[in-house]
């Protein structure tokens, strides 16, 4: 069946770039670009060093979930353990192991990379590398000075229901948890 959709060139070319802000967490840029139709436009976007997020599941089918206050939303959110890379060349797997251990005290002997997640692709280049971890051991946490996090283990099926009920607004948590469910069902 013919749809009438026509394929077009989508690539935009950067003409120049100006850094507007350089902070601890992110950098903001304003670029002038050439559009595929020949017109010029402006793109404002955030550059982020990147991050990791981990679904850590124990032998009872429970996953580690964090409760933390998120200032931009002025509310406590439930999320999987996550954190930013320490440098642009840091191995994401090593960052995932570090963040899981620091925030929850959990170490895992098995990790599977589930792929990249782009949380805000319209205005940021942030990439969150998603991991599934199992064969867990529990120890002491070592939170950063600016972190206040409560941790609990929640049944994976209950977490899925919380997502479907709209109780987990965090995108990386939704994507990673549902991907784990799909992977487990495919086995």
Regions found by a protein language model. Name each.
Residues 1-22:
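Extreme N-terminal tail/first-helix region
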Residues 41, 50-53, 84-171:
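Unchanged
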Residues 182-187:
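Generic C-terminal helix-cap and adjacent flexible tail
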